[in-house]
């Protein structure tokens, strides 16, 4: 089976310690990194490119076009299809979005979604439902998200339906200095074989703890020409 290491992490716009985030990502050696709150303002493309380079990864899609979500991959990962999603802005709330991609490692394809849900409960649920409807039509699927909500909530249930909650036994992920809430998730298709899941603490380089999963892709992956339906 083909091994795959995945990281999901909220990096708080690299405001705390951009070099520390890059060093932590390099040390974690992910094949796929799904980042939330990546730089999204003026010149953010350059900041995200620098982050990827310093971490030894490739910037694929995201940043401002995906409302702060960012997809980075290692050199061994091939990109079949990738695009950014920007959802309509709601009054008094931040714009939300996602990165969606179909990736390939050793000839085996899989779909990924990275997103950051709203602070408002109703908006959170609506965003989760919209994104689930647009998941790449390529099993197996991986989702990395900051849900701004905890297990059992309607939004968490909507986003995780049919997937395995890889971090369910790891404890809270926020805030980094004294974690009290588990609002970050790595979700995986049951077809993946899970070797190990961790919640390392890289120090105060951002306000969330990362989630890291070592997985194995199934021997045979179903393929499809690209992602699912557009998000509206």
Q: Where would I find each of the regions flagged by the language model?
A:
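Active-site neighborhood of phospho(di)ester-bond hydrolases with catalytic His/Asp-centered motifs
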Residues: 33-36, 60-62, 142-146, 165-169
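Metal-dependent phosphoester-hydrolase catalytic domains
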Residues: 77-84, 89-90, 136-141, 148-232
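Active-site metal-binding loops of divalent metal-dependent hydrolases
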Residues: 11, 38, 115-117, 145-147, ...
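Structured beta-strand-rich core segments of catalytic domains in phosphoester-bond hydrolases
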Residues: 32, 37-109, 198-202
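His/acidic metal-ligating clusters that form di-metal
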Residues: 100-105, 111, 125-147, 151-156
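Active-site-proximal beta-strand elements of phosphoester/diester hydrolases
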Residues: 3-13, 81-83, 100, 109-118
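N-terminal, active-site-proximal structural segment of metallo-dependent hydrolase catalytic domains
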Residues: 1-50, 129, 217-232
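Active-site environment of divalent metal-dependent phosphoester hydrolases
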Residues: 14-16, 39-44, 120-123, 147-154, ...
